[in-house]
Amino acid sequence: MRFKRDDGSFDVGRFKAAVRLFITAQEILVDNASYPIKSIAENSHVFRTLGLGYANLGALIMSYGYGYDSEEGRALAGAITAIMTGHSYEQSAEMARILGPFAGYRDARCAGVDHPADDTNEPYMLEVIELHRAHVDQILDVPRFAALKDEARRTWDAALGKGRAHGYRPAQATVLAPTGTIGFLMDCDTTGIEPDIALVKYKTLAGGGLLKIDNQTVPSALRNLGYSPDKIAAITAHIDQYDTIEDVVDEQTGQTVASGLKVEHLPVFDCAFQPRLGKRSLHYRGHIRMMAAAQPFLSGAISKTVNMPESATVEDIVNTYVEGWKLGLKAIAIYRDNSKASSPVSTERSGDGATDGPALAAEADGKTFNALQSRIQELDAEVARLKAAAAKPVRHYLPETRMDMAAWTKASSS
């Protein structure tokens, strides 16, 4: 979202500048980082594998007025991922021109392989780059994002040309991480390559309580879909009140309350989870198709959850893995709704099946409610007693066991 201009165009120049900056910073870290075991330290220096990625893709797609499970969304994801990885390898080749390629580029034995299939990895590394480049032509043709596809093609041409001349400094450049809670610190509506969990969700806090999180991309999407400011205000107010953009039946009056959104625009706002008062959610195949749009342009794999409904069968789950394999995914993780006792993020206001005190009082008769309240007071008193009796916490410092490459070399020679 940070690279989307006010006129809706994607700022490729700033995006590529960010890619250059961070891939260079990650390359510098290889020689300044510490590693838990010697083999990881050695491999990190022989191949210099990095892991640049992005977050908030789902919000970017929604902001344009496209659904996550749409050809336009997949075209945008493919083009942006292609530019990111292609320019990372272009910068990798530029660093190789000055510093030399990674140690295993021309010497296959330096990785500790006694009898490698070939003395050098150079032709195989170039073959990998050529495969990435060939997939650019398979990005879906969408007029609105045609310029991004053209830029992706130019970027991979440059990465291949410079790599043939100089080799590559990092052997691996990109992966897609989940970005989890840190995504909230980056002001993201969505994490990694994920769609939004729900337009309104509730995060369970470690210290107790719930944090209500509203999707901030909805107004931008509605503007792109042609809604007036008054309509946008009414729709966002509906979402805030009912936790969904769908028409709902009011729980108090029993009357249908319309959100004001046109039926044909509902798929734009489909999310991973079904909202409390709604019926819509993304089909699990939509998750797989989005991953397949990005995977050909990544060095590594994608860490992403494929959300499946509670009604999913064993056959559905098997088919999901098989379909992911057929589409060339390197990894796949499935979450079946309600398969865990608790969840850090949910669409329920009370979270984890908990019920607010007033609601509980209304549902239970007076005698039952009083008994429950008495039991709660007893438990609170027991917790207070245990806290008072507990010993003060003692801080135990971890040993200095992590070493950089120089330390490993010194330890091995002594």
Task: Please identify what each model-predicted range represents.
Residues M1-S414:
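Long, C-terminal-biased catalytic regions of enzyme "large/alpha" subunits
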